[in-house]
């Protein structure tokens, strides 16, 4: 679980911890990345709670979080652009809890991705019921990976660029390319 930079991810961390505290039968181990910008007193409070949970660990920051994501069985995140792209590119089941303030960017992205079947989404602005999060965590590793969802062209950007360039280069020029302009007097 990643709270991004941590400056506004405390609600997500609290909700995930509340789910593990309520439902001790969640079998999936959790590594919570608090983020370097989370307030120290909040970090300490979360770490005390984590000390009481057998299958939850935490770190403040990892400069190579992509390695953690690569080895994860699923990712819980707020749904910022970078993390969203990592969920897709590393082909991980994702549970996104987007923020809606100060912008709707994460919310729009997460809702559309859920509609397409790429990940699941919980709305974090409503009442954060620990049971709802526990259920979502239990279901996380059962949901399809993004690559199992057939959406033609979703991650074909490089292939499409190659095709467009090849098509352009294959076209014959109707006007010859002049390297030297003739000067007439």
Give the predicted meaning of each segment.
Residues 1-74, 126:
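Donor-nucleotide binding loops and adjacent catalytic segments primarily
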Residues 31, 57-59, 76, 95, ...:
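Hydrophobic/aromatic beta-strand patches that form the interior of the parallel beta-sheet core
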Residues 42, 63-67, 82-83, 132, ...:
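Short acidic active-site motifs
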Residues 43-51, 111-115, 138:
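Class I S-adenosyl-L-methionine
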Residues 64-108:
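A donor-sugar binding/catalytic signature common to diverse glycosyltransferases
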Residues 131-185:
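C-terminal amphipathic helix plus adjacent low-complexity
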């Amino acid at each position: 679980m990643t709270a991004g930079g941590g400056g506004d991810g405390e609600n997500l961390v609290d909700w995930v911890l509340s789910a593990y505290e309520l439902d001790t039968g969640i079998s999936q181990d959790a590594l919570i990345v608090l983020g370097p910008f989370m307030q120290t007193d909040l970090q300490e409070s979360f770490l005390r709670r984590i000390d009481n949970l057998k299958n939850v660990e935490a770190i403040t920051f990892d400069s190579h979080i992509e390695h953690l994501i690569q080895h994860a069985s699923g990712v819980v995140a707020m749904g910022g652009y970078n993390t969203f792209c990592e969920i897709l590119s590393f082909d991980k089941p994702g549970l996104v809890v987007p923020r809606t303030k100060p912008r709707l960017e994460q919310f729009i992205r997460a809702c559309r991705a859920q509609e397409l079947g790429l990940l699941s989404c919980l709305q974090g602005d409503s009442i954060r019921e620990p049971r709802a999060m526990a259920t979502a965590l239990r279901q996380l590793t059962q949901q399809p990976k993004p690559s199992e969802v057939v959406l033609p062209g979703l991650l074909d950007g490089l292939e499409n660029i190659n095709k467009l360039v090849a098509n352009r280069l294959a076209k014959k020029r109707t006007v010859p390319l002049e390297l030297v302009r003739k000067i007439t007097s």
